[in-house]
Amino acid sequence: FEAEFSVILVRGQDGEIRFWDSTRNSHDHGILATSSLPAGEAIAAQVDRARELARQVADALRYVGVLTLEFFATRDGPVFNEMAPRVHNSGHWTIEGAATSQFENHIRAVAGLPLGDTATVAGSVTMTNIIGADILQTEQWLGQPDTHLHDYGKAEVRDGRKMGHV
């Protein structure tokens, strides 16, 4: 495969579906390291088909809330990888990077409220997971412009453990 990407949607109680832009996901030792926009041409060429597949799943399940499906971009089109019936780590960029975050839209959907705008609010966005002892370098993260630190407040630092994201 050429790349992995996420399709994140929110479906309301009335069946309305909205999608956030799809991110290119990079992994390190099997753990999501980054989710980035723009995702690149290989992914952009496959997003419409992947969204249609995601829409079919959400509608068939009569799902309400945020649903994430991950795909591999291949020469033959998108290949399904996994599904998360919830807000997802690859969508944490929406907190500051979208008009309405995946968290807010999830609550809106399950509460029967109108869904919010999912538009990306910047030309490029990257969410980077902070893994293990990297959380001890918060000054490095906070010193960068347009960076927002999310420390999960976990008491124990362990190798391979997601401690936060920026």
Which stretches of residues belong to each language-model region?
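Short, well-ordered secondary-structure micro-motifs
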Residues: F5, L32-S35, N81-E82, I131-A133, ...
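Active-site "cap" helix and flanking loop/linker of ATP-utilizing ligase/carboxylase catalytic domains
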Residues: D48-L69, P85-A133
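Internal nucleotide-binding/catalytic subdomain
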Residues: F1-L69, A73-R75
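A short beta-strand motif that forms the metal-chelation/ATP-contact edge
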Residues: G77-V87
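Peripheral (often C-terminal) accessory segments that flank ATP-dependent C-N-forming ligase machineries
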Residues: R108-H165
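Contiguous C-terminal substrate-recognition/catalytic subdomains in enzyme active sites
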Residues: T74-D76, E96-G97
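Residue-level signal for inorganic ion chemistry
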Residues: V7, H106, V166
